[in-house]
C-alpha cells in the first residue's frame, strides 16, 4: 500500500508540485486582493465619513452665521435709528396739524389727511418709545414743507441704509466664520491623522479646535480641547472686527445713501401720486447710484500696506491700520490685550486672517453678492407693500376678488409703507421672512462653500 503511494507520487510528482504552486499562488493573490479591497473599503469609509463631517460642519457654520447676525442686528440698527429720526419728524408734523386745527377751532378727529395719518400709525412706529419727546422742540421753526421733505429723504435713506448695512454684515460674518471654521477643520483633521497614523505633527495654525469637538473620543481630550480657547487670541481678535461696521462703518454707508436719495427723490413732492412700478424704478435708480459710489476705488488709509486703494465697502467693514489697536481696546478687556501683545505671533496670525478676508472683499463675486442681497431685500419689501395695498383694495362684501391694477398713491403713503417695512428689517426674530431669505440665498451659500473649501489659503 505504501509502495503504491510512493510510486503514485513519484509518477505524478511534477503535477503535484505544479498544483501545489498554483494553490499557493492563488491563495497569496487572493489574500493580497482581499487586503487591498479591505484597505480600499476602509479608505472609502473614512473619506465618506470625512465628507459627511465637512457637510455637517459647513451646515452648522452657516447656521452660526445666521444666529450671530440676528444677535448683532439690534447693535447695528439702533444707531441708524438714532441718526435718522423719522418718528420724530412725524410727531412734529402731527404737532403742526394739531396747531392748525386748534387755530381753526376744529376737532382733531375731523381731520382728513390720510397720508399723515398713515405715517403716524402706531402699527409700525415701534421705535417711538425709544425717542425723547422733548427733542421735537428743536424743529419747531421748520415749515411743513421742510418737514415733509425731511420725512421723504430720511424714510428712504433709513430703509436703504438698513438694507445695505445688513447685507454687508451678512457677507462679512459668512466670510469670517467660514474662514475660521475651515481652519478649525484642518487642524482637527491633522490631529486625527497624527493619532490614527502615528504621525507627530505640530500645531502651526493656532486656531481653535473646540467647535463641535467632532473627533474627540473621551472626556480628557474634550477638556484639553476646551482649554485651548485661552491660546486662540488671534481668532478672538479677528472676530472683534465686526465692531467696526456696527459702530463706525455704517456712517459711511449712510452718507452715500443719503446723497443718492437726495439726487433721485429731492425734486419729488411727497403729495405726488406714483404707481408702485414708478416708485420701484426710483428706488432701483437710487440703488444703482449707491452701488457705483460704494464700490468705486478711492485712496484711503492703508489697511494692510501703504498706498493701497480701497472702496467704501472695505473701509466700512475694516478699520485703517492706525485704528486696529483702538478697535481691540473697544472690544476686549485688559487681560486679553496684555496676553495678545505678549506674543508678536498673535499680530501676525491676525494679519494673515485679515489679508485673506480683504482678498475676498475685493473680489467681484463678493461685490455682486452684496448688490444681489440689497436687490432681493428691496424686491421682498416692495412685494410686501403691494400685498398690503391690494388688501386695502379688497371689497369685504365680495367672496371672490378679481385682481385689479393698484391705483397710484401719494408718495407720502408709500413712505409710510417703507417705514413700516424698515421696522420689520430690525426684527431679529427667527421668523423674519426677509432676513431669512437674505441669509439663505444660493449665491451666498456658494460663496461660503468656496471659502470653506479653499484649503490652500
Curated annotation (Swiss-Prot):
Name a biological process GO annotation.
protein import into peroxisome membrane
A Pfam family of the record is: Peroxin-3
Q: What does this protein do?
A: Involved in peroxisome proliferation and/or membrane biosynthesis. Plays a role in the maintenance of the peroxisomal membrane in vivo.
- Highest taxon of source: Eukaryota
Topological domains on the Cytoplasmic side lie at 37-457
Tell me the organism's taxonomic lineage.
Answer: Eukaryota, Fungi, Dikarya, Ascomycota, Saccharomycotina
The family assignment reads:
Belongs to the peroxin-3 family.
| Protein location | Peroxisome membrane
Name of the protein in its database record: Peroxisomal biogenesis factor 3
Report the InterPro entries cross-referenced here.
Answer: Peroxin-3 (IPR006966)
Q: Which keywords fit this entry according to its UniProt record?
A: Membrane, Peroxisome, Peroxisome biogenesis, Transmembrane, Transmembrane helix
Topological domain spans for side Peroxisomal: 1-15
Amino acid at each position: 500500500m505504501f509502495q503504491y503511494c510512493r510510486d503514485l507520487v513519484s509518477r505524478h510528482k511534477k503535477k503535484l508540485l505544479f498544483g501545489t504552486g498554483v494553490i499557493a499562488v492563488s491563495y497569496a493573490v487572493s489574500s493580497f486582493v482581499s487586503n487591498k479591497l479591505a484597505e480600499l473599503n476602509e479608505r472609502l469609509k473614512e473619506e465618506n465619513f470625512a465628507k459627511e463631517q465637512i457637510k455637517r460642519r459647513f451646515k452648522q457654520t452657516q447656521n452660526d452665521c445666521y444666529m450671530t447676525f440676528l444677535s448683532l442686528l439690534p447693535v447695528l440698527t439702533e444707531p441708524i435709528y438714532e441718526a435718522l429720526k423719522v418718528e420724530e419728524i412725524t410727531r412734529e408734523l402731527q404737532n403742526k396739524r394739531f396747531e392748525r386745527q386748534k387755530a381753526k377751532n376744529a376737532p382733531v378727529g375731523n381731520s382728513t389727511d390720510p397720508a399723515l395719518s398713515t405715517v403716524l400709525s402706531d402699527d409700525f412706529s415701534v421705535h417711538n418709545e425709544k425717542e425723547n419727546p422733548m427733542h421735537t422742540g428743536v424743529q419747531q421753526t421748520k415749515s411743513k414743507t421742510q418737514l415733509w421733505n425731511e420725512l421723504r429723504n430720511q424714510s428712504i435713506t433709513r430703509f436703504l441704509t438698513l438694507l445695505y448695512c445688513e447685507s454687508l454684515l451678512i457677507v462679512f460674518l459668512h466670510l469670517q466664520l467660514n474662514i475660521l471654521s475651515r481652519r478649525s477643520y484642518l487642524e482637527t483633521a491633522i490631529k486625527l491623522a497624527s493619532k490614527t497614523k502615528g504621525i507627530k505633527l505640530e500645531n502651526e495654525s493656532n486656531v481653535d479646535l473646540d467647535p463641535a469637538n467632532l473627533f474627540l473620543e473621551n472626556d480628557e481630550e474634550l477638556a484639553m480641547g476646551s482649554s485651548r480657547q485661552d491660546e486662540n487670541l488671534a481668532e478672538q481678535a479677528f472676530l472683534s472686527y465686526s465692531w467696526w461696521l456696527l459702530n463706525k462703518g455704517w456712517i459711511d454707508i449712510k452718507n452715500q445713501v443719503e446723497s443718492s436719495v437726495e439726487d433721485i427723490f429731492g425734486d419729488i413732492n411727497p403729495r405726488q401720486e406714483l404707481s408702485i412700478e414708478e416708485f420701484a424704478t426710483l428706488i432701483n435708480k437710487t440703488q444703482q447710484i449707491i452701488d457705483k459710489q460704494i464700490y468705486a476705488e478711492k485712496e484711503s488709509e492703508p489697511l494692510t500696506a501703504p498706498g493701497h486703494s480701497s472702496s467704501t465697502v472695505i473701509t466700512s467693514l475694516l478699520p485703517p491700520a492706525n485704528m486696529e489697536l483702538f478697535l481691540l481696546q473697544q472690544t476686549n478687556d485688559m487681560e486679553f490685550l496684555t496676553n495678545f501683545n505678549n506674543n508678536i505671533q498673535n499680530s501676525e496670525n491676525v494679519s494673515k486672517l485679515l489679508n485673506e478676508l480683504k482678498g475676498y472683499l475685493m473680489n467681484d463675486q463678493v461685490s455682486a453678492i452684496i448688490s444681489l442681497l440689497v436687490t432681493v431685500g428691496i424686491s421682498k419689501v416692495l412685494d410686501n407693500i403691494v400685498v398690503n395695498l391690494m388688501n386695502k383694495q379688497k371689497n369685504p362684501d365680495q367672496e371672490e376678488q378679481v385682481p385689479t391694477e393698484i391705483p397710484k398713491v401719494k408718495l407720502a403713503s408709500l413712505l409710510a409703507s417703507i417705514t413700516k417695512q424698515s421696522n420689520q428689517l430690525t426684527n431679529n426674530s427667527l421668523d423674519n421672512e426677509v432676513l431669512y431669505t437674505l441669509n439663505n440665498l444660493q449665491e451666498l451659500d456658494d460663496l461660503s462653500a468656496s471659502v470653506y473649501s479653499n484649503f490652500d489659503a
